[in-house]
Amino acid sequence: MTSPAQRHMMRVSAAITAQREAAPLRHATVYEQMLVKLAADQRTLKAIYSKELKAAKKRELLPFWLPWVNGVLEQGKGAQDDILMTVMLWRLDTGDIAGALEIARYALKYGLTMPGKHRRTPPYMFTEEVALAAMRTHAAGESVDTRLLTETLELTATADMPDEVRAKLHKITGLFLRDGGDAAGALAHLQRATQLDCQAGVKKEIERLERELKPKPEPQPKAATRATRKTRSVTPAKRGRPKKKAS
């Protein structure tokens, strides 16, 4: 655990180094020290096979990096920062979509790139990982603020990425909106998902929502009841033989 003084120093150091707009941070002493710590954390994670245990370990490690992240986001001017981008990915792996989005706004604004051997561009990576994090949350029966998902779609709307990736995010957004009772919003996202990927697996759900949203026929007024026929009263026949007519 770091002390309050250490966290403050870390935050200030991050802010100072992040203000070097065009200069690479690799020549900053404090940044290099933080990269050494990050590499040690990554080695710890690499030794863990279970994805669930690995996510739990990342959740344990993340608080250490919070002062650095805050310093960059508050005063940074767009210098490439591998620490920041790694923390963004770790936050997604632990289901912290809101925290990752906080970094993504900054990263996409300044065009930061993914560190190391990551082949996906930041918008591509972020969209896909947000979708996967939301899918894991949905599978666990938990909820996600759909505003985070729609903001991600808006933030990466003009970025190039496989259509199937964007379709994943539209699909899970639609499913959460459906669960929240927004049938019209859900239908729009699911329709967009199937436009982007015909194998998105949402056709039956689209049909169900379309039936739900289809206007119900207005109830017809009841037909007027027919007037009951008056039945002629029949005079009961007199008993006995009828009288003979006079001849």
Feature-to-residue mapping (PLM):
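Residue signature of alpha-solenoid helical repeat architecture, marking inter-repeat boundaries
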Residues: K77-G78, T121, P162-V165, D197, ...
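Residue at a conserved register position within TPR or TPR-like alpha-solenoid repeats
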Residues: V72, W90-R91, A134, H170, ...
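N-terminal alpha-helical interaction modules that lie
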Residues: M1-D81, R105-D160, P215, P219-S247
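Structural register within alpha-helical repeat arrays
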Residues: T86-V87, R91, V130, R166, ...
